[in-house]
Amino acid sequence: MKQLLDFLPLIIFFAVYKFFDIYIASGALIAATALQLVVTYALYKKLEKMHLITFAMVTVFGTLTLVFHDDAFIKWKVTIIYALFALALGVSQLLNKSILKSMLGKEMKVADNIWAHVTWYWVSFFAICGLVNIYVAFRLPLETWVNFKVFGLTALTLINTVITVFYLYKHLPEDQRKELK
């Protein structure tokens, strides 16, 4: 259920874009992201920082898109969010306070150097996705960017999540690997 809630704003954005335009879709994205927060809080009685940051970014850049009637703002949102994720992960790792380890370390007991590898992998992933988004957003047609944002970045994120899980699994202590089988 929680994963479906995470994809709800993206699905609504895509559907509204296909039937209307980027401006109505941007407004729908703001509303859907707000709805996502309300439903998530109602069901789980807490909100993750990532959801709050995403909501703030969607609201700011979506509103700018609507006010100035310029789709560049909603396009930049993707790159800025990815840059913030990369920056947060990188800084946390440099301070030896890995965000990924704090999120998953209780369930997956792997060495600190493995968490560092995973963290830098995701820093690189987010940075590359942000740069590719700039290219696709400002060099290719709007329709291509919407498809890239909805399907391309989602698929790449899922693939990288699977790669990360396999990498972490490979480095789990043997007794913990047996528990997961």
UniProtKB/Swiss-Prot annotation:
<protein>
    <recommendedName>
        <fullName>Inner membrane-spanning protein YciB</fullName>
    </recommendedName>
</protein>
<feature type="transmembrane region" description="Helical">
    <location>
        <begin position="10"/>
        <end position="30"/>
    </location>
</feature>
<feature type="transmembrane region" description="Helical">
    <location>
        <begin position="72"/>
        <end position="92"/>
    </location>
</feature>
<keyword id="KW-0997">Cell inner membrane</keyword>
<comment type="function">
    <text>Plays a role in cell envelope biogenesis, maintenance of cell envelope integrity and membrane homeostasis.</text>
</comment>
<feature type="transmembrane region" description="Helical">
    <location>
        <begin position="50"/>
        <end position="70"/>
    </location>
</feature>
<dbReference type="Pfam" id="PF04279">
    <property type="entry name" value="IspA"/>
</dbReference>
<dbReference type="GO" id="GO:0005886">
    <property type="term" value="C:plasma membrane"/>
</dbReference>
<feature type="transmembrane region" description="Helical">
    <location>
        <begin position="118"/>
        <end position="138"/>
    </location>
</feature>
<keyword id="KW-1003">Cell membrane</keyword>
<keyword id="KW-0472">Membrane</keyword>
<dbReference type="InterPro" id="IPR006008">
    <property type="entry name" value="YciB"/>
</dbReference>
<feature type="transmembrane region" description="Helical">
    <location>
        <begin position="148"/>
        <end position="168"/>
    </location>
</feature>
<keyword id="KW-0812">Transmembrane</keyword>
<keyword id="KW-1133">Transmembrane helix</keyword>
<comment type="similarity">
    <text>Belongs to the YciB family.</text>
</comment>
